[in-house]
A protein has these predicted regions:
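Conserved mixed alpha/beta catalytic, RNA-binding, or beta-rich assembly cores of soluble enzyme
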Residues: 160-269, 280
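Bacterial N-terminal signal peptides that target proteins for export
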Residues: 1-9
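Short, Lys/Arg- and Gly-enriched loop/turn segments at beta-strand edges
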Residues: 62-73, 97-108, 208-218, 307-310
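Intrinsically disordered, low-complexity linker/loop segments enriched in Gly/Pro
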Residues: 99-196
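Short, structured beta-strand/loop micro-motifs enriched in basic residues and often containing a Trp
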Residues: 31-41, 69-75, 177-185
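N-terminal, Lys/Arg-enriched amphipathic/low-complexity engagement segments
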Residues: 27-68
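Bacterial N-terminal signal peptides
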Residues: 9-19
Length: 327
């Protein structure tokens, strides 16, 4: 890699994190957002955060969660990460993520986003799907979702797995991407692996990074095929770190079991290709695999998840179990 990357608040060794450097004086900050924004872009920050800092915050509530046709609240942010410069990696640890509402909403919206119905962009001869709004009850201290289905004479009771659909930095250049879009900046990836205990790596394109988050889901199946998860509000605790001089092209995710790469584009096959190439290069650069050995490893060990197949860009997650990687 040439000159050693200078690391602020964290040291990267073969893809694993060590104890933060002793000179980092972390603070715990509490932040209650007042209003959301519709795009991921460079704008006046709502909070300034130093590497190592912990932020206790929450997603935004509003009419969307409480009534038919209610307004979407937008994204929280941006947080300005002190010391972040283009070519760094922003490391976002999700220390805690919990629902803080007694209900969640999932909708079928005619002409909007769905993996199995026509949308507003393409004219079709078949009729749109009917509009439906399902209100799930959140019970047992936020651990179980319950939905009565009177048309089917059935009742669903399922364990919940809270996640954040959207984590992002400001995109490259002067671009502003709407909240529905995922891309190399993160955004609306709808990856169910972005949950408590996960660490998300995002490329930095601007001084300060400009971090955003939102779109809490109490639960979501792979693909998000109807166009929404169990949409609800969340309490979340982040810790922010920087890896100076470590340049990545696309988002990465880690947890105790897996390293993961995310590709977001259409068609779906290209999203898979992006995530696969990113994983091969991660093994090559950080775990010191020879390139074609890395490809063979990915070919036999990778698990692939369609995170979403409904957004303007589709998203695919490629996962490699850590137990097969060198320590």
């Amino acid at each position: 890699m040439g000159r050693k990357a200078r690391i602020v608040g964290v040291v990267l060794l073969f893809g694993m994190f060590s104890t933060p450097a002793p000179e980092a004086r972390a603070e715990t900050r509490k932040f209650k957002p007042q209003k959301g924004v519709p795009t991921f872009a460079v704008r006046e920050p709502v909070l300034r955060v130093a590497p190592g800092d912990v932020v206790e915050t929450e997603t935004l509530g509003g009419g969307y969660y409480d009534k038919e046709g209610g307004k979407w609240p937008g994204e929280v942010g941006p947080f300005f990460i002190e010391g972040a410069t283009p070519g760094d990696t922003l490391v976002v640890k999700i220390l805690r993520l919990r629902t803080n509402s007694d209900h969640a909403v999932s909708t079928h919206t005619p002409g909007f986003i769905s993996a199995v119905a026509s949308d507003r962009y393409t004219r079709m001869l078949n009729a749109p799907i009917p509009s439906r709004r399902y209100v799930w009850r959140i019970e047992k201290n936020g651990t179980v979702g319950v939905l009565d289905l009177p048309n089917s004479k059935k009742r669903l009771e399922v364990p919940l797995s809270p996640m954040l659909g959207r984590v992002a930095v400001a995109p490259d250049g002067e671009e502003a991407w709407g909240g529905l879009w995922p891309g190399n900046f993160g955004g609306n990836m709808d990856a169910s692996d972005v949950r408590e205990g996960a660490t998300v790596h995002l490329p930095v394109f601007h001084e300060g990074a400009y971090f955003y988050f939102g779109d809490g889901h109490a639960l979501q199946g792979d693909g998000e095929v109807c166009g929404s998860g169990l949409e609800t509000t969340m309490e979340v605790t982040f810790q922010f770190e920087l890896i100076k001089g470590k340049k990545i092209a696309w988002p990465r995710i880690e947890n105790d079991e897996f390293i993961m790469t995310v590709g977001s584009v259409r068609p779906l096959s290209d999203a898979l290709r992006i995530a696969t190439v990113e994983m091969v290069e991660w093994l090559e650069n950080d775990y010191k695999f020879e390139r074609w050995d890395a490809l063979q490893t990915v070919s036999q060990l990778a698990q692939m998840r369609v995170a979403n197949m409904v957004d303007p860009n589709y998203a695919v997650v490629v996962k490699i179990p850590k137990r097969f990687l060198p320590k």
